[in-house]
């Protein structure tokens, strides 16, 4: 779930480095012979790698633990509503997703968020209060909305105004988002801006998240300008001077009319006949010698180097690969790679994850005293509620909800309530409905419901994440043919994952097969 732009992530280094090129620029004429490629993980990262490999003339095999492709991207149609089980959109500012969608022939299916209706509320003291207009994450850029908001106290407003006077300051090392924002704007800005916003995006706590990894743009602005507000305003002025189109701004978010599942289906259709997909749950490594044959389906139990290549164990048998892309969660990669590089496996195992839950509640619009206002609301931890956030789907995107229906997507879990995933669907639905009624002020009962659980699916970029990545990259540099992709490294969004899969494919297409 994303309500606001968090800025462009830092370019990765070494094997995790993001390509600065906006599209695949390599000569895709296939080398002869092509390397044998195995991709572990059939989410958007692994599928993107497979798509660009197939585009370059290479075949590969995807090993996916779930019975379907797409990972956390999953779309359902219920009573005319388009329901996203996971992410519902992607940031327009990051181009990789739109580039892939264009290549898949889905450009006419792209829709933008209804930004003229984009109001995000924050619950405080039992009331829903809109975020001040002009807020860029936690950075105020307009004085009047800041002065008139009921979300912040006068002492915090004064402090945020005086932040304009801050001088540049050298910041050695990494620190938490909470420390960084509190130094600039005070503790209340952490509690009612940073915490609810980052809980909605990362499912994590600002006291644990790395500011260097999560808000790299703000770190750069603080280093250059001292004041975040002054830095954001200066960047906006530069952008306006370069933009001579005079047209309306791009929508903050984009998606597909029929849901993001359209993209997964289109990739699967595009690679059919070129990419083999095998299903089975990834498990622990079992070192063994060279083995022959492979069952059609079974759990991928581990990988180990085989000379200069890799052997991947599935259901007691082994398959070989010259190039291996590990595009599953880092904790799964840790188990799989223990026989390849123990230190790399240990590092991957230190990437924390949080769990999340999406609850879709469909209501009769006639049961509401008034139509829902804005994109939705955020619930800070201080409010002591189980709901983390809620999106009014029909307001955020057109074509998603038929007339006469109100669809709410509620979010629970994260680091503040990991135990929620252990509760029954009935208990979760009762709690989510009751809190939604209380917070939004209505008594309607849902006409239909859906519950989606995502255990250990949201990577946490905790303090020290840049140092961890540097060591991961150092280990990767000593293992030719091994690539990592996914949301555990240099960006959690759909465009970030697509970019990493594409870059892995670019590297593999440049490598001939081993003789």
Where in the sequence are the language-model features?
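Conserved flavin/dinucleotide-binding core of flavoenzymes
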Residues: 132-134, 371-374, 387-515
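N-terminal Rossmann-like FAD-binding beta1-loop-alpha1 element of flavoenzymes
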Residues: 35-62
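Conserved Rossmann-like nucleotide-cofactor binding loop
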Residues: 45, 68, 331
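Active-site/ligand-binding neighborhood in enzyme catalytic cores
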Residues: 116-119, 139-143, 156-284, 302, ...
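Mid-domain catalytic core of redox enzymes
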Residues: 56, 108, 281-291, 302-409, ...
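Dinucleotide-binding Rossmann-like beta1-alpha1 core, especially the glycine-rich loop
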Residues: 79-168
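Intrinsic disorder/low-complexity segments
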Residues: 1-33, 288-309
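Glycine-rich FAD pyrophosphate-binding loop
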Residues: 54-78
């Amino acid at each position: 779930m994303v309500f606001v732009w968090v800025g462009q992530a830092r370019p990765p280094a070494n094997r995790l480095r993001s390509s600065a090129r906006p599209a695949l620029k390599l000569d895709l004429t296939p080398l002869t012979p092509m390397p044998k490629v195995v991709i572990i993980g059939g989410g958007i990262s692994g599928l993107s790698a497979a798509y660009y490999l197939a585009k370059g003339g290479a075949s590969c095999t995807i090993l996916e633990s779930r019975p379907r492709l797409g990972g956390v991207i999953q779309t359902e149609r219920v009573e005319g509503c388009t329901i996203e089980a996971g992410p519902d959109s992607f940031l327009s500012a990051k181009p990789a997703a739109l580039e892939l969608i264009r290549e898949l022939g889905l450009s006419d299916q792209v829709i933008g968020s209804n930004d003229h209706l984009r109001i995000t509320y924050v619950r405080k003291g039992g009331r829903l209060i809109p975020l001040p207009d002009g807020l860029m994450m936690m950075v105020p850029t307009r004085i009047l909305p800041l002065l008139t908001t009921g979300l912040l106290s006068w002492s915090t407003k004064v402090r945020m105004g005086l932040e304009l006077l801050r001088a540049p300051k050298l910041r050695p090392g990494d620190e938490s988002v909470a420390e960084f924002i509190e130094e600039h704007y005070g503790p209340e800005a952490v509690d009612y801006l940073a915490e609810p916003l980052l809980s909605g995006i990362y499912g994590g706590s600002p006291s644990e998240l790395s500011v260097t990894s999560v808000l790299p743009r703000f770190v750069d602005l603080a280093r250059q300008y001292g004041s975040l507000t002054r830095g954001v305003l200066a960047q906006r002025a530069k952008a306006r001077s370069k933009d001579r189109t005079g047209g309306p701004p791009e929508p903050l978010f984009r998606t597909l009319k029929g849901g993001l599942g359209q993209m997964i289906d289109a990739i699967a259709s595009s690679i059919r006949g070129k990419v083999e997909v095998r299903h089975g749950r990834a498990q622990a490594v079992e070192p063994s010698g060279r083995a022959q044959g492979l069952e059609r389906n079974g759990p991928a139990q581990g990988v180990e180097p085989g000379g200069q290549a890799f052997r991947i164990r599935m259901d007691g048998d082994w398959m070989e690969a010259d190039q291996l892309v590990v595009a599953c969660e880092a904790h799964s990669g840790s188990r799989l790679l223990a026989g390849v590089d123990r230190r790399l496996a240990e590092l991957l195992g230190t990437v924390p994850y949080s769990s999340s839950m999406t609850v879709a509640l469909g209501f009769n619009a006639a049961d509401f005293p008034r139509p829902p206002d804005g994109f939705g609301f955020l619930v800070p931890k201080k409010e002591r509620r189980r709901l983390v956030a809620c999106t009014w789907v029909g307001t955020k995107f057109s074509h998603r909800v038929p007339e006469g229906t109100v669809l709410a997507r509620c979010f629970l879990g994260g680091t503040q309530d990991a135990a929620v995933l252990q509760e029954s669907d009935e208990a979760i639905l009762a709690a989510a409905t009751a809190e939604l009624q209380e917070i939004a002020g209505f008594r309607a009962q849902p006409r239909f419901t859906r519950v989606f659980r995502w255990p250990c699916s949201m990577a946490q970029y905790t303090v020290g994440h840049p140092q961890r990545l540097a060591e991961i990259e150092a280990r990767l540099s000593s293992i030719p043919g091994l690539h990592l992709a996914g949301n555990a490294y240099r960006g959690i969004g759909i465009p970030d994952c697509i970019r990493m899969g594409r870059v892995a494919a670019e590297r593999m297409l440049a490598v001939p097969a081993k003789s």
